[in-house]
Amino acid sequence: MLRPSLLSLHEAPVIQPVPEHERVVLAVDLPALGLRAGDIGCVVHVHPGGAGYEVEFCTLTGETIAVASVIASQVRPVTAQEMPSARRLVG
């Protein structure tokens, strides 16, 4: 197995943490919570260094469906070129 050198670790791009209260898009399914990739949530807590987040997912009427602990790679910021859509909750 190849291991990255210390030099390559330092050359890796720095990803800026998403600040609290920003909207994010879920990048993976979280079936245990009934969440799907593409669901939109709000960051309610940023773990040290932006390694992970607590993200609240709500219905369009504001009812909280889940608060998920995710690592940074499981979410991404929303972009200006995206439009949300609605889906029926299962269960």
Place the predicted regions along the sequence by residue.
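Basic/aromatic-rich interaction segments and small domains that mediate binding to polyanionic partners
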Residues: 2-86
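Extended, low-polarity transmembrane helix blocks
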Residues: 90-91
